[in-house]
Design a protein with these regions (language model features):
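Conserved H-loop
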Residues: 77-84
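ATP-binding/catalytic-site motifs of ATP-hydrolyzing domains
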Residues: 19-21, 25, 172
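ABC-family P-loop ATPase nucleotide-binding domain
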Residues: 197-199
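ABC-family ATPase nucleotide-binding domain "signature/switch" substructure
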Residues: 4-12, 36-45, 51-58, 63, ...
Length: 199
């Protein structure tokens, strides 16, 4: 349901019916390269190469100043100083030598460097402990500034400040609005929020 919906945006799947538009143009009118170059994707499962932290952050062509800003804003600087070789520390296959929170921060730094106008966060905090989630939420807040962001989250703290929240159930949109609007409707969103925050 939810992941399938956002996977339609970068055209991992084609729309069977209806139309998805970006800037009033159907997404099919863009080349895949053009479309995907304008989308950053951060998922629960981060793909890392058996290489250094630095090489896992960059995919080429970035200045050291840009890299340093991404490192600071994604809170990577809070753990790289403790590693034996800092940015040059190797992460192992799929980042096995790093915690889940550290891997997520590398994915966030990548998205910051890409600086795409569309951001998709697909359950990006679901497997993290609450301390890592707090750090990553700060990084997400920075990353989401001035861009269209699609967030799939069961942890509602991730989306409380969203301009528009859609609640899906059985593949259908059942509620839509801001956090305050949805709380006042006392529907599925409000119930889930009350369960998570005991309010």
């Amino acid at each position: 349901g939810k992941s399938t919906l956002v996977n339609l945006i970068p055209r991992f799947y084609d729309v069977a019916s209806g139309c998805i538009e970006i800037d009033d143009l159907p997404i099919e009118s863009y080349t895949l390269q053009s479309l995907r170059s304008n989308i950053s994707l951060v998922t629960q499962e981060v793909t890392l190469f058996n290489d250094t932290i630095e090489n896992n952050i960059i995919y080429g062509g970035h200045t050291s100043d840009e890299i340093q800003v991404a490192i600071r804003d994604s809170h990577i600087d809070e753990f790289i100083d403790d590693l034996p070789k800092g940015l040059q520390t190797r992460v192992g296959d799929q980042g096995i030598l790093l915690s889940g929170g550290q891997r997520q921060r590398i994915a966030i730094a990548r998205a910051m460097l890409k600086d795409a106008p569309i951001l998709i966060l697909d359950e990006a905090t679901s497997s993290l402990d609450s301390e890592s989630e707090k750090l990553i939420q700060k990084a997400f807040d920075r990353l989401m500034e001035n861009r269209t962001t699609f967030v799939i989250a069961h942890r509602l703290s991730t989306i409380e400040n969203a301009d528009r929240i859609l609640v899906l159930s059985d593949g259908e949109i059942v509620e839509e609005g801001t956090h305050d609007e949805l709380m006042s409707q006392e529907g599925d969103y409000a119930l889930l929020h009350k369960m998570q925050f005991n309010d």
